[in-house]
Amino acid sequence: NILAGIKVDTGAKELAGFKNEKITEGLDGLRERLLDYHKLGARFAKWRAVITIDETIPSDACILGNAHALARYASLCQESGLVPIVEPEVLMNGNHTIETCYEISKRVLNTVFEQLCMYRVVLEGIVLKPNMVISGLGCPEQANVDKVSEMTFKCLMENVPSEVPGIAFLSGGQSSDLATAHLLRMNEKYSDQMPWNLTFSYGRALQNDALKAWNGSDREAGQKALYHRACGNSFATHGKSLTHS
């Protein structure tokens, strides 16, 4: 079955007083909007927070402000009968190492779940959509697939409660191949240790191959490329490679 959902935040805006940091807005009138969306058939919603890594950021204020907004959104969703997708994204932009990404992702997830619990969000009724723990795009030393899977799994195990039923990764600017490979390796190595299901909620990493193959005119090639990439990611959620199935 296919269920309809809707993005309900109004975007990430400049956080006043905090240079180069953003806060996601959209809480005003959200209760009424969610009730309307549910009547129209929506069964889940999405709210994205973005966290930037640089020498002096993210600040505690940015992390807490975004976590607070995510928690209030999630609480209102559950009140309205919608499943909230909780998306705290630590951006890949920057020169930071994978170790720095791990430390920041840990802070973000810990704060998000503190706020979710404070606002009495039922963790069994959410989907977490986090970033993977990965090197910054400008980092001269790019972590390999094994390192990414190891540190991402470690970060999740330390900070995501077992009550959460599912984790659907965002791709966040990874290549299509790497996004699939990272998901595959985590499910290959750690599936017997995980209390939650690991799956994907990719945008660019799912669509890029299809857009290149389509090239504005070749509909059949685009469809085949999309199907192939979707199958590869689907297999990866079960710890299986499409090429060895």
Question: Where does each model-flagged region fall?
Answer:
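Active-site cofactor/substrate anionic-group-binding motifs, chiefly glycine-
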Residues: 1-41
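Acidic (Asp/Glu)-rich catalytic clusters
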Residues: 1-5, 34-42, 75-79, 118-121, ...
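Glycine-rich, proline-tolerant flexible connector loops at the mouths of alpha/beta enzymes
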Residues: 15-18, 49-62, 90-96, 137
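Glycine-rich anion/phosphate-binding loops
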Residues: 19-33, 58-73, 106-107
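Hydrophobic alpha-helical segments and helix pairs
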Residues: 39-50, 66, 70
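Short beta-strand segments at enzyme active-site cores
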Residues: 44-49, 81-91, 121-131
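Active-site acidic/histidine proton-transfer and metal-coordination neighborhood
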Residues: 61-85, 89, 93, 98-103
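Active-site capping/gating regions of soluble enzymes
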Residues: 96-245
